[in-house]
Amino acid sequence: MAIEMQQIIELILAIFLPPLAIFIHGNDCNMHVAVNIILCFFFFVPAVIHALWYCFFRA
């Protein structure tokens, strides 16, 4: 199972800068970016979980 470079970058960004990871993954500023920014202001761990879900587990 090969991991692509973009996935590695998204994983690192999802941990340290969750809104940026969502922005890069979605290629636009959508509702998920706004939700994640709000989560970052209030709770950092849920923002990381949301970014990981959006980048890797969303169908």
From Swiss-Prot:
Subcellular location: Membrane
Any coiled-coil regions, as ranges: none
Keyword Transport: no
The keyword Secreted appears for this protein: no
Topology in the lipid bilayer: Multi-pass membrane protein
Transmembrane domains' residue ranges: 5-25, 37-57
GO CC terms: membrane
Subcellular location, principal: membrane
Record-linked InterPro entries: PMP3 (IPR000612)
Family: Belongs to the UPF0057 (PMP3) family.
Name assigned to this protein: UPF0057 membrane protein F47B7.1
Naturally occurring in which organism (per UniProt): Caenorhabditis elegans
